[in-house]
Amino acid sequence: MIRSYKCVDNPSRAINKETYTNPKLMAEFAKAGRYISLPILPIISLCLGVKFENGIKAVPIFEKIEEIDLQMDYENQAYKTMVKALEILDPAKTVIEIRGPLATLDNLLELTKVMRAMKKKREVLNDLYDKLSDIYIDFIKKMLEKGIKVFSFSESILDPKVLGEKEIARYVDDFLEEFLKKVLLLENNYKFTFHLCPKSTFALIDLDKAYFEEIKFEKPKKYIDILFSENSLMGDRCINLADKSFDKVNKIKIGRNNA
């Protein structure tokens, strides 16, 4: 059985419209949270052409899943603003947030149509998973080159109460497992931590696609400090617990535990 995970609340903060276009204001906003993080809007979706009403609600740009054309535009002004904000901050202390493919496709199309495609357009959906996987890896490489040390990858809809266990298992098989293998290959050239939302983590663990390896500390450490020091795949708890301290956590190891 795949466990559910109750998200840890991270209350939204009021944001001035100018913050979306002003690197200095964006950097100040990024520093004011529980941990320093960018972007303040889903940058992958923005670079794929999505607009956000009032900085919150995505305006889908496709009617049918077959119409989706995944062309990343790194000349997008939102991306350039984020990079400038990152330069103001310390990249080595900034978490880069990435939303998973279901969230991105929701922005591009609308979630109800994506869920319909899970049943009727599986091949089209899997092709989009493959393309998004490559887009994510390319984006991660760009951020690593700028000195980023921690990434947070979330897929908030990945809950058996919403999608059902069968669809979550398909998501893991068709996207997540292979994507994470690509991420881990980057460790050959870079040192960084890749943090998964626990919803993804427990899907992997409960489907026997991964296992935990415990790390203990002599004294409790803030979770955010652990993430910046471990250089590994992690995610046994929500990143919104960044300011909480723990004396032990778990790394995630892909594959079966044969020990």
Q: Where would I find each of the regions flagged by the language model?
A:
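N-terminal basic, low-complexity leaders that serve as flexible interaction/assembly modules and, when applicable
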Residues: 1-58, 168-195, 200-259
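Glycine-rich, proline-tolerant flexible connector loops at the mouths of alpha/beta enzymes
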Residues: 18-19, 41-77, 150-168
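Acidic (Asp/Glu)-rich catalytic clusters
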Residues: 34-38, 86-91, 141-147, 184-188
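Active-site-proximal loop/short-helix segments
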Residues: 49-53, 97-117, 146-172
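Active-site-proximal, glycine-rich beta->alpha crossover segments in alpha/beta enzymes
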Residues: 53-142
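Metal- and O2-centered redox machinery and metal/ROS homeostasis
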Residues: 76, 138, 158, 258-259
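Hydrophobic/aromatic residues located in beta-strands of well-ordered beta-sheets
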Residues: 94, 151, 191-193
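Non-heme di-metal
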Residues: 131, 152, 180-181
